[in-house]
Amino acid sequence: LTLGQILAKERAVLYLNLESYSGFEELLGKKFPANLSDLFYYVRQGNENLIHRMNGMIQTVNNLDFIPPVRTPSDIRTVDWEDWERLLQEIVLHSSYEVLILDMGENGDEDFRLLEMCRKIYMPVLNDTLSVCKVTQFENLLRIWNKEKILEKTEKVHLPFHMDRISSDAYVEQLVWSELGDYIRELLRKERS
């Protein structure tokens, strides 16, 4: 979310939160009339005006466009690969967005296909024993499945903890100017040089 807001200052960015429990309605303090579940309904129907439908669902926070995430976990977990592929192709080929950010949770085997489509993958990691073991298991599975290309484009990031210093009423906007925002800007600066 912070990365998207920072990039959106210079480029057209669409943020898709694919987590089962995103907390977006609570975080932003409002209900959304349509969300990613509705968009996938149109994808499954083979709607020819998919980008037009999508544009009607777009919400914006701090210059960052996003489609509100699903409300129920099953809505994201039951999306077929063909539907993911069609949606992403439509966005890449027929929308005005230069950057598409997928904020992924844990949605099953489709995650690996989505990761294969990404140019860059940032993986937040922790240094505690259990977290390191989980990352190692993930990496080993990628090797077993011959998905080393995912590993090659993955950068592990140790994000600074930032929760305590940001007021709840403007949390999302304040992320950009938090310690996390500084960390992301430095990460992008290093990538560009």
Question: What residue ranges belong to the model's regions?
Answer:
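A structural signal for short coil/turn segments at secondary-structure junctions
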Residues: 8-11, 95
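Cytosolic-facing regulatory segments adjacent to core modules
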Residues: 46-60, 68-104
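Conserved nucleotide-binding/hydrolysis micro-motifs of P-loop NTPases
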Residues: 20-22, 71-74, 107, 129
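Phosphate-binding loop that captures ATP/GTP phosphates
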Residues: 10-66
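Conserved catalytic-core segment of NTP-binding enzymes
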Residues: 86-178
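Short, flexible/disordered intra-domain loops and linkers
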Residues: 27-28, 32-33, 75-78, 169-170
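NTP-binding/hydrolysis catalytic cores, primarily Walker-type P-loop NTPases
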Residues: 170-193
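Glycine-rich phosphate-binding P-loop
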Residues: 1-9
